[in-house]
Amino acid sequence: MSRTPSRRGLLRGLTVTGAAVIGFDPAARSWAVTASGSATELAGLPRLDGTLHADHASLTAAADDYGHIVHHRPVAVLRPGSVRDVVSMVRFCNEQRLPVAPRGQGHAPFGQAQVEGGLVIETAPLADIGPVGKGSTTVTVGAGARWSAVAKATLAHGLTPPVFTDYLELSVGGTLSVGGLGGQVHRHGAQVDNVTALRVVTGAGELVRCSPSRRSDLFHAVLAGLGQCGIIVEATLRLVRAPETVRHYRLSYDDLETFLDDQRVLVREGRFDYVEGQVSADAGGAFRVHTLEAVAYGPPTGPAPDDAALLRGLRHDPSTVHSGDLPYYDFLDRLAPLVAADKEAGVWTYAHPWLNLMLPGSSAATVSARILNALTPADLGPGVVLFYPLLRDRLTTPLLRTSDEEVSYLFDVLSAVPPDDTATVDRLLTANRSAYEAAAAVGGTQYPVGSIPFTRADWRTHFGAAWPRLKSAKRTYDPRGILVPGQGIF
């Protein structure tokens, strides 16, 4: 363990790139840097396999995210060369009471992974995957591995994780910290429900292996725990047989309630392996175009899809059915060309004041209709409105909160606003708060990957019966409260 430096003591044993850190001032709660940018041997910090960065470009990048709304500037960014680096630096930050946040792909929209005056740990270098064999039932991966890479590595052996988010270029550690929802949840639960073990660095700098049967309190406090009790550095994921091809259906509906009812029927009956839906604006700007997306997996995981059996009894417009077969990975990665086009058009730099709500099935149509009636195409911009039907009994992770009803819906309004239009961003943030309150009034909550202003009291309400266990785990595993302050929970 590194010794505590004196008030203006030099820090030894670390090579820092960019602006060189020459000392930490506990009274001022800051690290001093030289302007020379030369690499310098410093005192007190542990030696690292990776690098610590305090240059302007690194700090500016870490003070931004996909939302481009919140900006909290750290004093340093760690690019670890090993898990040992994460352990050592978290231990040092705990000694000095410096806040710490891990950052995967920077896809958070509201400053969740930012940290003012502290240390950001980039997890992308921790991206090992495997080994995987033909008969494997699990795979162990680094927290910085992207789901696209995990899919490719496992598909080489005819295997796949059972649940994916629609966008594959997210880090494993990032989605496991929030939940990991997609169109397969009604069959397999969330991504967090398909984890068999973790390696975690606690807020005290302890490296811990945990699972449902070993240090289970930490295991359950970290999955969907928003980084409050530990930093995931490695996860063991469940694997299932992968289909070779899938059949993708798109069904059109005239009204919201029928659209949601048919989603409910499909997940209750388990006809499809993937169910999702979109709502878009009609020619007059009203959000009345409803498209249900459903996917049936083919051999070797299931029989060849039978169109008549799969679509029987549904109330879509039969004249507008679109279906097609495609390779499984192409289906998983179907957003890739859209993302590439968005980046080329500059949309990736837009502000993203996202609304993500968990709505109880009995109130989903009423609450979402009110929100959609107030939404304009200009508010949504080049974004999208999504519905995912969820079955309560498949969601077993305590900190992944949803309604108590059998069927809930994840309702997403994923707006994209030109970055200089701060008035619209502020207005949408206010609207997001109002929408959350409407959801909470009927037993819903947020899925915490969006941009909803939240207080500490809101978080206690959000976690509900799970709050005492989370609070206890926070005291045990992050007693000085240094981890992920950007969530605003404690």
Where are these regions (language model features)?
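C-terminal segment of N-terminal export signals and the immediately downstream linker at the start
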Residues: 4, 24-67
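Short glycine/threonine-rich loop-to-helix capping motif typified by GTGT followed
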Residues: 286-290, 335-345, 392-405, 457-468
